Amino acid sequence: MEWHDEGLIIGLRRYGETGAILEVFTPAHGRHFGLVRGGFGRRLRALLQPGNQADFTWRARLDQQLGLLAVEPTKLMTTRLFASGLALQGMNLIAALLRLLPERDPHPELYAVVRVLLEHLDEPAVAPILLARFELAMLTETGFGLDLSACAATGATQELIYVSPKSGRAVSARAGAPYHDKLLGLPPFFLDGSLLKNPTLEEVEAGFALTGHFLMRDLFGPRGQTLPDARHAFLAETAKTYPRVAPQCF
């Protein structure tokens, strides 16, 4: 068995004296593990850090085996990530979220989103918005996507400012007003056509409150887990670094 693919390193742990088990995320083969001989040695370890991108070749006698990974780094992100607390915690959060995916299950569209996100992780005005949208995409990819297309009560497609915490469907301002305290806020940047607006910090935090509710209810909670520590750390960095007046997002 053999495959070749590009991808992102999301985890590394020692195996034996100098070997390493590498966890990667690729477009065609999803989240995948493989043994890298000498991967924990002095020469390779620095190249195999989470966030770095590479071309991978995986080989095994049988498909269900761990297999061997050959790694050809294509883009090293370690220095850039460690220079920014926001970027470092963002990468840790991305890795934690990707571990919700079944092993070897391809998610090419999600991989494309991650590639864009990595390019902006150290940008305080952009990274939180993109990461919140990534969490929204994770819910969709795992079968728990929200329906933000129309009001659950009236069918209206305008003034959608709430989401039902039970159904995951959008609710309009008028229909949701009597239940304001029981509904989750829906920030404009989660809706199509609103990417050019400048979200406030409060809107960004509302976005993470929304995705966090459903991530906990549908994904982390059933596994007996809590939301990742990296998520709390990323939100703390966001609160410190997010500009009061954000530049144009895309």
UniProtKB/Swiss-Prot annotation:
Gene3D superfamilies: Nucleic acid-binding proteins, Recombination protein O, C-terminal domain
UniProt-listed InterPro entries: ARFGAP/RecO (IPR037278), DNA_rep/recomb_RecO_N (IPR022572), NA-bd_OB-fold (IPR012340), RecO (IPR003717), RecO_C (IPR042242)
UniProt function note: Involved in DNA repair and RecF pathway recombination.
SUPFAM superfamilies hit by this protein: ArfGap/RecO-like zinc finger, Nucleic acid-binding proteins
Protein name: DNA repair protein RecO
HAMAP family referenced in this protein's UniProt entry, alphabetically: RecO
One of the Pfam families matching this protein, by short name: RecO_C
Keyword annotations of the record: DNA damage, DNA recombination, DNA repair
Nucleus listed as a keyword: no
